């Protein structure tokens, strides 16, 4: 529709007392990209409607609350401010007028009038007062108010045109605008309640939640620190145990493994164990004592290593000569074994004569001089032939006596 025609209809509605319909027509005119002259006419009509609202504010308790909140003055200051040639600012003023009218009509017939203070307090975001809105605030208000209203407004205009010109067109246009105002107020009420809860009632709850999280995190951290301390103590115990084991193993075996009798890290293991045991808190004398013990153990392990080395060398030499010596040992063993058997047989058959000389034959008989007498002649087949002898042998001693046997 033509902008001039929309402005003309708005003037007609205002003169007839249809202020809501006048606001709807001015809104359509401001959205139709008006020129400067048209914007000036729109601005003049906005101020006239604002004056009417101020003259018809709600009475009773609402009026007292409105005056206490300063809603009237802030409302008029906002609508009387210069729009500075911005159609978006004018749309913000028209949105404010539509919100006041919709809010007041929803309160019922018992309280006829416009509740300006409540709307201004709602828009300013403070429950105890209201503030004037500048050009930028009005532009933001228009953007929020009409963000989903272009289609709804077009539908309202279409419905009004379908019902016919005159009453149908005007009625349909403000219905869509009132719907936008209701949605806008509901969204602002929810936002305000959320802000009040965040800044008021739930502020301590937020602090309590933060404190609970903080204490819980500290408890976990302290528990983790305690656990880490326990693990560290256990780890230190394992390190000390490993140091002691390394001392014994490396120190004990170091001399054996080194060809020159060196300790193979025994002293370093002792020093590491001493350092773990001291923990940086013992005196230097204790450190020197551990160093002296380490040196003594080192010398001991070196001596053991040398002894073991000499022992190994002796075993190797013995094994090197084992081939020649084993032959001698075998011969000696055989010799000793044969002699042992011979002595057993020889000694078992001997009969001692009077001079103690052994007889060389088990069948030999000794004479008076102890000379062995052979029991017979040996023939070619190895048999002895004996002879019989009867008689006595006599011997004369130095005294001339003759002894007979």
From Swiss-Prot:
Subcellular location as annotated: Cytoplasm; Nucleus
Span list, region Disordered: 149-172, 185-405
Keywords per UniProt: Amyloid, Cytoplasm, Isopeptide bond, Nucleus, Phosphoprotein, Prion, Ubl conjugation
Chain intervals with Polar residues compositional bias: 358-368, 375-385
Residue stretches of biased makeup (Gly residues): 155-171
Membrane-spanning parts: none
Keyword check for Transit peptide: no
Modified residues (Phosphoserine): 143
MF term (GO), any: identical protein binding
Tagged with keyword Ubl conjugation: yes
Other information: [PIN+], also known as [RNQ+], is the prion form of RNQ1. [PIN+] is the result of a conformational change of the cellular RNQ1 protein that becomes self-propagating and infectious. This conformational change generates a form of RNQ1 that assembles into amyloid fibrils. [PIN+] promotes de novo [PSI+] formation upon SUP35 overproduction (cross-seeding). [PIN+] can be cured by GdnHCl and by deletion of the molecular chaperone HSP104, which is required for [PIN+] propagation.
Domain notes: The prion domain (PrD) is a Gln/Asn (Q/N)-rich domain, which is unstructured in its native, soluble form, and which forms a parallel in-register beta-sheet in its amyloid form.
UniProt-recorded name of the protein: [PIN+] prion protein RNQ1
């Amino acid at each position: 529709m033509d902008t001039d025609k929309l402005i003309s209809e708005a003037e007609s509605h205002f003169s007839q007392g249809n202020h809501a319909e006048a606001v709807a027509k001015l809104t359509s005119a401001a959205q139709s990209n008006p020129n400067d002259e048209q914007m000036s006419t729109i601005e003049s009509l906005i101020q006239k409607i604002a004056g009417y609202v101020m003259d018809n504010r709600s009475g009773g308790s609402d009026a007292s609350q409105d005056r206490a909140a300063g809603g009237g003055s802030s409302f008029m200051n906002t609508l009387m401010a210069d729009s500075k040639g911005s159609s978006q600012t004018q749309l913000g003023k028209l949105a404010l007028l539509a919100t006041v009218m919709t809010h007041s009509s929803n309160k019922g017939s018992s309280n006829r009038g416009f509740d300006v203070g409540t709307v201004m307090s709602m828009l300013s975001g403070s429950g105890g007062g209201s503030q004037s809105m500048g050009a930028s605030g009005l532009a933001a208000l228009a953007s929020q108010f009409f963000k989903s209203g272009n289609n709804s407004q077009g539908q309202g205009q279409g419905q009004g045109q379908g019902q016919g010109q005159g009453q149908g067109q005007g009625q349909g246009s403000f219905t869509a605008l009132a719907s936008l105002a209701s949605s806008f107020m509901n969204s602002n009420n929810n936002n305000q309640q959320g802000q009040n809860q965040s800044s008021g009632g739930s502020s301590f709850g937020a602090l309590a939640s933060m404190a609970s999280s903080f204490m819980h995190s500290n408890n976990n951290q302290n528990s983790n620190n305690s656990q880490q301390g326990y693990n560290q103590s256990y780890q230190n115990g394992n390190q000390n145990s490993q140091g002691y084991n390394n001392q014994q193993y490396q120190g004990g075996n170091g001399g054996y493994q080194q060809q020159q009798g060196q300790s193979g890290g025994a002293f370093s293991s002792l020093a590491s164990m001493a350092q773990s045991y001291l923990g940086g808190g013992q005196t230097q004398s204790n450190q020197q004592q551990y160093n002296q013990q380490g040196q003594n153990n080192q010398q001991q392990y070196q001596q053991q290593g040398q002894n073991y080395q000499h022992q190994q060398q002796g075993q190797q030499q013995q094994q090197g000569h084992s081939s020649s010596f084993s032959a001698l040992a075998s011969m000696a063993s055989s010799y000793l074994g044969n002699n042992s058997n011979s002595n057993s047989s020889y000694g078992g058959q001997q009969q001692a004569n009077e001079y103690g000389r052994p007889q060389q034959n088990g069948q030999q008989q000794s004479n008076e001089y102890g000379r062995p007498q052979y029991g017979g002649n040996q023939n070619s087949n190895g048999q002895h032939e004996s002879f019989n002898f009867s008689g006595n042998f006599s011997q004369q001693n130095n005294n001339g006596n003759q002894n007979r046997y």
